[in-house]
């Protein structure tokens, strides 16, 4: 870790600006170069199509006006440099850049953005609980779920039962691509009303006659059989507040805080005491200290500091469980033991054994790989259940069973039920068969862990039926592989792409042959030379993900990567992916996992951490658990930088 702390300074830059005094910092020099040299080029030649009213390819240069802005978009500049040097941008109908301007852009990119820099944690930012985090936090706080009626749940393909997720608006993905990246999503008055409704619903259920066990746990006492909530005593109310408050705040609370909450309850009895108790509990649940993460940590304006153990417990629990810290984490935070590296490793191991760790696959995995797209694509509930749950169970297996990271691509273990059994050829005979009730055509059947033997065309996430169904054509499949698995940045395609022309009269061209003609445009070819070999490698699978068995009629699935590596079919491509492309796949896995864990878009200052973790995982054929341990012990996870002026 010490190597991550060594400082690497920017080189002086494109030009030596003679009027600068020699004592000016490299950082100031870099800022002057961008603002005085590169920014005018962007404004003159790029902003017309990539800024203000028109934003092509999701690239907005109007928001990049300083070196700091440029640093925050570090992934963008490789593509920008590529298209400029290949004469693909500016487009033909715009004045081209001069040779001198191209040299300036290239030199600036190489010297300013490729120079190693110091590893730093992210800026301290409180984050609102996402919808799933809020639901899980309520559940672990009270011991029960708030659910909608069964009839309402059955109206959706997902069968969503959670009242929380039904009522709260869906969180949009943040800049990181994940919905837990909520810093820029404030709480509106309408959403606050919904939180109030949910708080009332939870409290009414807590004090209902059927919830005695949860109430007894909070009171820390056994209640008489004929006890009624209106008969609550002062001692019982105090026990509830003392138990509830630190669990809701996610850190142990001082006696002063507890006494202030208890003051309005004193001298009250019976129904009045119950009403006052509910009011105080609701106030806690509507407090920013409950709805946001990180508000209670001590602040040190202008400093880089380790986060306290309670913040570390929150980061750990919402990363691995999407839920509040349990009693074990709270106790370790209180004793100051949690920040020790060996303790964190032990807790990762413990937490991955908990059923709560399924959230890593259901939330992180689904968002990373775009699996939720199946919700819109497959409307039939039985098929949806099979195609969507199979990759989730596979990811859960990788994450929780200490499996190598690269098994994401190649694994003999899968999960099957009758809904996907038909995709596995002769291996189907070894699968468990479930009898269905008479009169019912199809029904959901349970999944089982299964070892592949003869279905060699399966194995790993890429060839799962749901993934192939979700990406039905070679361009979709190639784009998904590049973006989600290899982590290659691709701009959005132009809006005015002409349709693929049919075969000329007298020629029976395949789709691939017709597409070769279609993509002859130079600006398209740059991306398609990366996309097409990967996408067409999967042409032996039809639009539903079924493997084509007729060897005499198989389409051409061969290809050549930009690296020069050739393959005849996906089986050969898979071998390339797990060997020469392994580091790239591991690096993207590290990048996506760290971004999810930190609930933010990564910056240039995270790259040394990604480099180090990737190196360790590749060298040791590391597992997903190794990756998680590396992340929770990393600089970005354990530390933060406080701004000079802190809001809130």
Residue ranges and their predicted role:
Residues 28-79, 86-88, 93-97, 421, ...:
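Sequence context surrounding c-type heme c attachment/ligation sites in exported
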Residues 257, 261, 288-293, 312, ...:
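Extended, hydrophobic alpha-helical segments in both membrane/secreted and soluble proteins
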Residues 108, 133, 141-142, 183-214, ...:
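Extended surface/linker regions that mediate inter-domain or inter-protein docking
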Residues 2-14:
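Bacterial N-terminal signal peptides that target proteins for export
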Residues 15-26:
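Hydrophobic h-region of N-terminal signal peptides that target proteins for export
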Residues 231-236, 269-279, 302-312, 352-360, ...:
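Structural motif
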Residues 228-280:
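A conserved hydrophobic secondary-structure block that centers on an alpha-helix together
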Residues 25-222, 247, 251-254, 258-263, ...:
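Aromatic- and Gly/Pro-enriched helix-to-coil junctions and flexible linker segments
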């Amino acid at each position: 870790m010490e190597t991550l702390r060594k400082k690497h300074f920017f080189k002086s830059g494109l030009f030596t600006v003679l009027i600068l005094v020699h004592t000016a910092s490299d950082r100031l020099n870099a800022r002057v170069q961008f603002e005085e040299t590169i920014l005018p080029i962007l404004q003159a030649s790029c902003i017309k199509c990539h800024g203000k009213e028109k934003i092509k390819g999701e690239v907005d240069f109007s928001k990049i006006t300083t070196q700091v802005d440029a640093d925050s978009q570090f992934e963008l500049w490789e593509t920008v440099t590529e298209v400029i040097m290949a004469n693909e941008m500016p487009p033909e109908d715009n004045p081209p850049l001069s040779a001198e301007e191209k040299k300036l852009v290239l030199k600036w990119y190489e010297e300013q953005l490729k120079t190693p820099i110091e590893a730093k944690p992210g800026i301290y930012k409180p984050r609102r609980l996402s919808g799933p985090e809020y639901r899980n936090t309520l559940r672990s706080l009270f011991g029960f779920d708030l659910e909608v009626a069964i009839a309402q749940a059955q109206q959706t393909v997902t069968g969503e039962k959670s009242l929380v997720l039904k009522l709260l608006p869906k969180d949009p993905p943040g800049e990181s691509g994940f919905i837990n990246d909520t810093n820029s999503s404030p709480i509106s008055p309408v959403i606050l009303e919904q939180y109030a409704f949910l708080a009332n619903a939870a409290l009414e259920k807590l004090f209902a006659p059927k919830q005695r066990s949860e109430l007894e746990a909070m009171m820390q006492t056994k209640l008489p059989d004929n006890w009624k909530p209106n008969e609550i005593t002062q001692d019982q109310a105090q026990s509830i507040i003392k138990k509830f408050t630190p669990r809701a705040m996610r850190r142990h609370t001082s006696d002063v805080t507890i006494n202030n909450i208890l003051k309005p309850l004193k001298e009250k009895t019976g129904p009045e005491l119950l009403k006052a108790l509910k009011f105080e509990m609701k106030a806690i649940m509507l407090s920013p200290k409950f709805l946001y993460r990180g508000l209670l940590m001590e602040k040190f304006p202008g400093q880089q500091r380790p986060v306290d153990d309670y913040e570390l417990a929150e980061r750990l629990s919402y990363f691995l469980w999407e839920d509040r810290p349990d009693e074990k984490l709270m106790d370790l935070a209180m004793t100051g033991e949690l920040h020790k590296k060996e303790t964190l490793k032990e807790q990762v191991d413990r937490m991955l054994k908990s059923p709560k760790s399924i959230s890593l696959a259901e939330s992180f995995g689904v968002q990373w790989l775009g699996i939720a797209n199946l919700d819109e694509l497959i409307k039939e509930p039985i098929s949806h259940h099979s195609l969507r749950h199979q990759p989730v169970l596979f990811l859960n297996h990788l994450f929780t069973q200490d499996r190598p990271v690269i098994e994401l691509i190649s694994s003999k273990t899968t999960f099957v039920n009758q809904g996907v059994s038909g995709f596995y050829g002769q291996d189907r005979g070894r699968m468990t068969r479930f009898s269905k009730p008479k009169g019912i055509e199809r029904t959901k059947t349970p999944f089982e862990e299964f070892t592949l033997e003869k279905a060699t065309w399966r194995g790993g996430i890429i060839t799962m039926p749901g993934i192939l169904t979700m990406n039905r054509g070679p361009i979709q499949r190639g784009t998904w592989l590049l973006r989600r698995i290899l982590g290659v940045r691709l701009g959005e395609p132009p809006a005015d792409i002409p349709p693929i022309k049919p075969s000329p009269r007298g020629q029976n061209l395949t789709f691939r042959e017709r597409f070769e003609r279609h993509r002859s445009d130079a600006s398209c070819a740059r991306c398609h030379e990366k996309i097409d070999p990967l996408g067409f490698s999967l042409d032996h699978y039809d639009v539903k993900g079924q493997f084509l068995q007729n060897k005499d009629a198989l389409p051409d699935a061969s290809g050549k990567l930009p690296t020069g590596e050739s393959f005849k079919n996906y089986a050969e491509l898979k071998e390339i992916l797990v060997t020469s492309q392994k580091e790239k796949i591991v690096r993207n896995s590290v990048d996506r996992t760290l971004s999810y864990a930190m609930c933010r878009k990564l910056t240039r200052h995270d790259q040394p951490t990604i480099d180090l973790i990737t190196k360790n995982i590749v060298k040791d054929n590391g597992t997903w658990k190794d990756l998680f341990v590396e992340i929770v012990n990393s600089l970005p996870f354990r530390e933060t930088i406080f701004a000079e002026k802190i809001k809130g």
